[in-house]
């Protein structure tokens, strides 16, 4: 019967936890990148639609332009609020004494 060293098991568990934390942070970063891409896409779409409406091109109504502008505005406001929460959490963590 083979008895495995307790310290060896403990170290492997810690490495597994670090790997899980790394994967979670990568998922968070990927999510932020995707969200910022969507915000950029909304803003570009709103800009293009408003330019088409100003140039009186067919197929673009004022309703569509206003809806796209509001989507763009709301998504940007949400991004700013998320950024503020992240900065606030970072500052709170950095102000804690160890």
From Swiss-Prot:
Keyword annotations: Bacterial flagellum
Single GO term (MF): cytoskeletal motor activity
Main location: other
Disulfide bonds: none
Source organism superkingdom: Bacteria
Record localization: Bacterial flagellum basal body
Pfam families: FliE
GO cellular component annotations of the record: bacterial-type flagellum basal body
tRNA processing recorded as keyword: no
GO biological process: bacterial-type flagellum-dependent cell motility
Family, as annotated: Belongs to the FliE family.
Full protein name: Flagellar hook-basal body complex protein FliE
Species for this entry: Buchnera aphidicola subsp. Acyrthosiphon pisum (strain APS)
